[in-house]
UniProtKB/Swiss-Prot annotation:
Protein's recorded name: Putative O-antigen export protein
Domain of life per record: Bacteria
Transmembrane segments: 3-23, 41-61, 81-101, 129-149, 152-172, 185-205, 231-251, 269-289, 310-330, 332-352, 375-395, 398-418
Organism of derivation: Yersinia pseudotuberculosis
Localization per record: Cell inner membrane
Function: May be involved in the translocation process of the nascent O-polysaccharide molecules and/or its ligation to lipid A core units.
Name of the coding gene: rfbX
Pathway per the UniProt entry: Bacterial outer membrane biogenesis; LPS O-antigen biosynthesis
Entry keyword set: Cell inner membrane, Cell membrane, Lipopolysaccharide biosynthesis, Membrane, Transmembrane, Transmembrane helix, Transport
Length: 437
């Protein structure tokens, strides 16, 4: 029996993520020893910006993936799509470089102003170094999306794992006498994140160069379609980032370094659960996109029934294992640092993962069929609620309040709206098809 391609892709993602998670866990111990609790807190705040810089392609990666999937479903060539996406992204990256050089003193002061052991110049240098590395890393997103659309997502999963391995090797060889914490933080960023940037650029060149001989690749309609659809994905991604990526920004303004490090360790631990399911959704995206192009929406309902249940089981089982091993995990990652996993936070992180399984599935369904309007309607409200509720919760109740605010933003908005919108959209498409017949 032939194993479905999306299962192979998901399995490769799980394997590579296990490698990456192990490396991230091991790096916590190295970085805590190298930088101390305060220095590592700075490293985690800066590292949280990776998700923001992945938005630097303005949604072109997701748009390109969908367009390639549609063409593959109709047995059409797509070299012009790849080259058009690369041409479109060049001025975008030039703009980001200018913004980084101009705004780094102000952004670094906002993010790192609470870390008094760094002066303004040191904060700005740390931010600029990290920003240029993360911006370069985002270039690889184009190649990864192409491989996913070609049902070769296992390549996109292996490369980040390889980057993590190389980054860990560099980090382990980094000497430090603790005399200059700012330089230690910068060199740690270099060691840990530059491999991902390097492999990302190489991957994109590998996919693009063979297509350069394509004639008439600069089609205005193709370019317009990519940018138009990419704009929708970009808007949604920005709003999603305002929901999911503001936690470290809020904590940098409201909580002490110790709470920030505790949150970082727990989020990485529970993040393994999220990635297991997210990898499955990523591998299913092109499958759903092709099914949508053929109006086979019964496939969506099969996926809904099978994989949401699977996600719930994974969350419950993994959370129980984390509860049993909580002391062991802390002793391995931060020996002698007196950190611990409160039961209240374990319960909240577990419930949050259940909510994410539910909402992320329907978000992927809607994006795979190119229906982003329900996301545009709901996510802005969620973004406002997420930031404000996390801030109020963190100020009044610490980490527990921050997580409660994040979860509440999902329950009030997208957890019910996205399933309703997906079913309504499919019913409308099916009805229109019947009328045409």
């Amino acid at each position: 029996m032939r194993v479905p391609t999306h299962i192979i892709v998901a399995a490769s993602a799980w394997g590579s993520r296990l490698v990456s998670i192990f490396i991230q866990f091991y790096s916590i111990k190295i970085l805590l020893d190298l930088l101390g609790t305060e220095g590592y807190a700075v490293f985690t705040v800066i590292g949280s910006l990776v998700g923001w810089f992945l938005l630097a392609d303005f949604g072109l990666g997701n748009s390109l993936q969908n367009q390639i999937s549609y063409r593959r479903a109709n047995h059409q060539e797509y070299q012009d799509l790849v080259l058009s996406a690369v041409i479109a992204i060049i001025p975008i990256f030039i703009l980001f470089i200018i913004l980084i050089l101009t705004l780094s003193p102000y952004i670094s002061e906002f993010l790192l102003g609470g870390f008094d052991f760094l002066n303004n110049n040191q904060r700005s240098n740390i931010f600029k170094v990290a920003s240029f590395i993360f911006l370069t890393t985002s270039i690889g997103n184009l190649a990864y999306k192409i491989w996913f659309s070609e049902h070769k997502g296992w390549v996109s999963n292996i490369i980040p794992a390889l980057s993590s391995i190389v980054g860990l090797v560099f980090l382990m060889r980094l000497p430090s006498d603790g005399s200059n914490i700012s330089e230690d933080i910068i060199f740690s960023i270099y060691c840990f994140y530059i491999p991902a940037a390097f492999f990302g650029v190489i991957s994109t060149l590998f996919k693009v160069i063979p297509y350069l001989k394509c004639k008439n690749f600069l089609n205005k309609l193709t370019l317009y379609t990519l940018i138009k659809n990419g704009g929708g994905f970009f808007l949604f991604s920005v709003l999603s980032a305002l929901v999911l990526q503001v936690d470290y920004i809020v904590m940098s303004q409201t909580l002490v370094e110790r709470d920030l490090v505790t949150y970082n360790i727990m989020s990485k631990t529970f993040g393994l659960i999220n990635f297991i399911y997210a990898a499955l959704l990523q591998s299913l995206w092109p499958v759903c996109a092709e099914a949508s192009s053929k109006l086979r929406f019964d496939n969506f309902y099969k996926i809904e029934k099978k994989y949401i249940s699977f996600g719930f089981i994974i969350v419950i089982a993994s959370s129980f294992v984390i509860f049993l091993l909580k002391d062991f995990i802390v002793n391995i990652l931060a020996p002698g640092k007196d950190f611990y996993f409160p039961i209240s936070l374990i319960i909240l992180f577990s419930f949050y993962q259940v909510v994410r399984v539910w909402t992320d599935t329907y978000a992927m369904f809607l994006m795979s069929i190119g229906k982003l309007k329900p996301l545009w309607i709901s996510v802005p409200f969620q973004a406002v609620l997420s930031g404000s509720l996390q801030w109020v919760g963190a100020v009044n109740y610490g980490l527990v309040g921050l997580l409660c605010g994040l979860i509440a933003s999902f329950l009030i908005t997208v957890s019910w709206w996205l399933p309703f919108s997906f079913r309504s959209t499919v019913d409308r498409i099916v009805k229109d098809k019947r009328l045409d017949e």
